[in-house]
């Protein structure tokens, strides 16, 4: 009997109900997905998630999430381990990429796939390093407080300066997701940074951590981890942010994983020096 091939694969848009399958595969890869990421992800682009099926059984996944008219982000590129090497991943990739409709696409690629991404037109921007460690006890900063609904406009504006696209729909959900805790720092009445920590499969995840200065980032980091003293925490930091890496290394965090931020073309200028921790590897 002939084994099913790519010609037998049916790729369709995934729904939020399919998210447990996708996030389960991601967890099996050691990516430590957040426990309540799905609603925030689908809020940004409900049509940006795809599953490949053979005879109705999920075998592959990918997301191509659009932000406005110029930018998209690719993630969740997965094939069931026992079915790799049969062309299902590439077939899923080709079917889903059309969703970007000419936008510049970004991704955070695992080491094993980076050469394939280069062949598909992606160029390296920088490495992103995941650091893991135990949340330390710290002294609260009076300028840091939990984010409130009234802060949404200010945080959306700050976020837009630190990311290559506006993402108000995503941010509104991300700040208030189940188990998510968001903090901001105001100095002289102006937002100088914000961050979010959330529960995940293996370790608490911080992301984003956007801040004007290392001092702002340190104050936010302390607030984010205040209720997690002794728990394992993970944060993904662009290698270009030496101050961010120094901050976590000082706390005893060590590298555990790396990806490469890659783009297919130019992106809107943003304050990359403020990115002390990326939001997610799946949606950028």
Which residue ranges define each predicted feature?
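Intrinsically disordered, low-complexity, positively biased terminal segments
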Residues: 2-8, 15-20, 40, 53-54, ...
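Disulfide-bonded cysteine-rich modules in secreted/extracellular proteins
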Residues: 143-147
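Hydrophobic alpha-helical segments and helix pairs
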Residues: 91-141
């Amino acid at each position: 009997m002939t084994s099913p091939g790519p010609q037998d694969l049916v790729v369709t848009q995934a729904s939020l109900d399919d998210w447990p399958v996708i996030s389960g595969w991601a967890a099996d890869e050691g990516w430590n997905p957040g426990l309540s990421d799905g609603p925030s992800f689908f809020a940004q682009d409900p049509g940006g998630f795809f599953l490949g099926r053979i005879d109705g059984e999920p075998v592959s996944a990918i997301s191509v999430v659009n932000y406005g008219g110029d930018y998209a982000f690719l993630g969740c590129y997965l094939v069931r381990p026992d079915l790799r090497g049969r062309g299902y991943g590439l077939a899923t990739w080709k079917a889903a990429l059309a969703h970007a409709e000419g936008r510049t696409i970004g991704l955070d690629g695992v080491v094993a796939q980076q050469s394939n991404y280069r062949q598909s037109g992606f160029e390296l921007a920088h490495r992103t390093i995941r650091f893991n460690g135990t949340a330390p006890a710290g002294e609260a900063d009076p300028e840091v407080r939990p984010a409130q609904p009234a802060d949404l406009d200010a945080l959306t504006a700050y976020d837009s300066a630190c990311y290559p696209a506006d993402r108000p729909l995503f941010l509104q959900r991300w700040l208030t997701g189940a188990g998510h805790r968001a903090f901001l720092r105001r100095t002289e009445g102006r937002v100088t940074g914000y961050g979010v920590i959330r529960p995940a499969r293996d370790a608490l995840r911080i992301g984003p951590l956007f801040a004007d200065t290392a001092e702002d980032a340190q104050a936010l980091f302390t607030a984010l981890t205040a209720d997690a003293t002794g728990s394992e925490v993970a944060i993904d930091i662009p290698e270009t942010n030496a101050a961010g890496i120094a901050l976590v290394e000082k706390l005893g965090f060590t590298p555990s994983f790396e990806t490469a931020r890659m783009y297919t073309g130019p992106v809107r200028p943003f304050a990359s020096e403020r990115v002390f921790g990326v939001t997610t590897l799946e949606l950028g």
